[in-house]
């Protein structure tokens, strides 16, 4: 079993950066995101207000799974702070570089560090794109990101495989219209985030009917990597109905 990362749009207007005199409003990062939240706060994130909730289906994993796989908490930024201003200046230098940075080994190391940091930042609050209820298009919603305690898995692509980040308009159009880059992640060497039954703590579903359907699916599963019957039983024992247990929180 594995999580498949996808190129996800991040609103970066708060950084106020430009490329070739054109303001950058968003970039796409290949990632799988997790929230490090206590169970008693889960209803706020699952249901939220209007379209801000993420839904009642989720998988809870042991934290050691994330730590062992190099999953990193994001850094939340106050857009008015001095560190954010200095970061803005550094990113502008990196984006406007004409090749000089990559002629010096020390500067290469510094630029690589900055680049990885760029992929793991988020404002304290702001807007984000989220699939609508029908799963047909993105809608933009307002969120307090700091409440999510987000951790990110970002695949370690080889330099000749896929882009580490999309910011050019033609690349963004290709991804947003057809998931051009996301569909290629399965072909990369280290793109998938593998996990096992033992890594799972709970599986939440919205209703008893959904639990019955999921149990039936697990029992019938034949395609792909086979799961031994004993592990199927363990997996089934981890399934919880959200609406049944939320009152206990």
Curated annotation (Swiss-Prot):
InterPro entries: AbiGi, AbiGi-like. It holds the Pfam family AbiGi. Signal peptide: none annotated. The keyword Oxidoreductase does not apply. Keywords: Plasmid. Confers resistance to phages by a mechanism of abortive infection. Seems to act by interfering with phage RNA synthesis. Does not act at the level of phage DNA synthesis. This is Abortive phage resistance protein AbiGi. It comes from Lactococcus lactis subsp. cremoris. The lineage of its organism: Bacteria, Bacillati, Bacillota, Bacilli, Lactobacillales.
